[in-house]
Amino acid sequence: MMEWRDEGALLSVRRHGESSAIIEVFTAAHGRHAGVVRGGASRKIAPILQPGAQLDLTWKARLDEHMGAFTVEPLRSRTALLGDRLGLAGLNAICAMLHVTLPEREPHSTLWQESMALLDALDRPGWPPAYLRWEMRLLEETGFGLDLTRCAVTGSREDLAFVSPKTGRAVSRGAAGGWADRLFPLPLALLGQGPASAEEVRQGLAITGHFLGRELAPLLNGRPMPEARARLMELLARA
């Protein structure tokens, strides 16, 4: 018998049979993991199984490769976000992006900590810049981090103003020349220079979205990025 105990956030839930549910969670030590919750559709347990909920999880299976079953205890509910359209959109985007980005059962402890901190921040104003930084971390976890430290053409660290949509590397204003309109504008927020304006967050998310879409293309099989992320971008564009 295989067994472990861990803490995780619920990414998704679907009914299984008459009274059970299959949940997917992102855990601290075991990564993205699915399992059955017996009685998960019951009046007692179903209210606990809400996306974003932080859970104390015990997983058991006869063999490691089996789906196995979870027992769950609530640690933190995030149902308060149900009344906050932007916060709820952020939560749904986080859950959807973790689902499509992470391989099953592969630990990502730093990303887990940062994801929990971001989920905790969603009920406070001013969290979109943190979401942008989180997507940059997500890019790094896919193996494709942006290189914004120096100009890809000249090697200079000064006057970095653009990002190449091909390489993800910074380009200085002088080196861009006539190619500037084919490059992404580089918001100072991505360089960690000063507070991020709403426009800079939108510019930054256009960059991370471009590269996440490209890197995730084999997993998406021609499908677009998760609708939950598109919904968040739509709301941020109106803000």
From Swiss-Prot:
CC annotations in GO: bacterial nucleoid
Keywords: DNA damage, DNA recombination, DNA repair
Alphabetical list of Pfam families matching this protein: RecO_C, RecO_N
Gene3D superfamilies, per database record: Nucleic acid-binding proteins, Recombination protein O, C-terminal domain
GO biological process terms, semicolon-separated: DNA recombination; double-strand break repair
InterPro entries to which the protein is assigned, alphabetical: ARFGAP/RecO, DNA_rep/recomb_RecO_N, NA-bd_OB-fold, RecO, RecO_C
Domain of life according to the entry: Bacteria
Family: Belongs to the RecO family.
Function: Involved in DNA repair and RecF pathway recombination.
Protein name: DNA repair protein RecO
Organism of this sequence: Cereibacter sphaeroides (strain KD131 / KCTC 12085)
